Amino acid sequence: MICYSHKTPQNSATITCEEKTCYKFVTKLPGVILARGCGCPKKEIFRKSIHCCRSDKCNE
């Protein structure tokens, strides 16, 4: 699986992951992404802010 690893959509760096999911951690501000990467973090406190998917496309 290949996931994006940068915080902004303009950066196109990717990483290769063993996991079959990617995630992005977003804020309440539109378009602001704090982190992207492999897997799907399960922290309950951040759950509504973390979007996980089985494709790098939803990590854009």
UniProtKB/Swiss-Prot annotation:
Stored Pfam families: Toxin_cobra-type
Transmembrane domains' residue ranges: none
Matching Gene3D superfamilies: CD59
Tissue expression per record: Expressed by the venom gland.
Principal cellular location given in the protein's record: secreted
InterPro entries in the cross-refs: Snake_3FTx (IPR003571), Snake_toxin-like_sf (IPR045860), Snake_toxin_con_site (IPR018354), Toxin_cobra-type (IPR054131)
Localisation: Secreted
SS bonds (residue pairs): C3-C22, C17-C38, C40-C52, C53-C58
GO molecular function, one term: toxin activity
Family: Belongs to the three-finger toxin family. Short-chain subfamily. Orphan group XI sub-subfamily.
Name used for this protein in its record: Toxin 4.9.6
Species assigned in the record: Dendroaspis viridis (Western green mamba)
